[in-house]
Amino acid sequence: MPRTPSLSSDGSVARVCRLLPDAETGRVALVDMRAACGFPSPAADYEAEEVTLDQLMVRNPLATILVEAAGDSMVEAGIYEGDLLVVDREVEPRSGSIVLACYDGSFTVKRLRLDPKGRIELHPENPLSGCGVLRPRPGEQFEIEGVVTGLARRF
């Protein structure tokens, strides 16, 4: 995947990866079962089908980018440093969506909220991060680039 650098809000460089719809991808077996994360369930015979991760994670390949998360402002939303965020640029952002936004020349990932007057606010999801609510004002550079629809993480 081609990668282009972009600046995150703290000045560090994050990677942005574009998905290539014609690229060959490896297939992984998707087993037709649910794995208990609490008490184990009895084993059984399960069917498997082959899928690619992009088939599971990407709804609009031509409008989707992957962005590496930097910082800790979204940990209570389950987004951690180094996570690869699936960002769909065609999904309509709504209040409550987690969005990738360009604000004053920096990219940031925050929870989109509307104040009582319908004005946009971008909320962090970690009160300990030191990042406050962002409230774009008229005349400031601001654009929602897309909605975060999923993520991938390595252990």
Q: Language model features by range: what are they?
A:
Residues 75-76, 89:
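Short, conserved secondary-structure segments in the cores of folded domains
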Residues 82-83, 97:
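Structural motif
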Residues 103, 108-139:
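Aromatic- and Lys/Arg-enriched surface recognition patch
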Residues 95-99, 110:
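Short beta-alpha junctions and helix-cap segments that line functional grooves
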Residues 1-75, 106-107, 119, 137, ...:
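Short, positionally conserved secondary-structure boundary motifs
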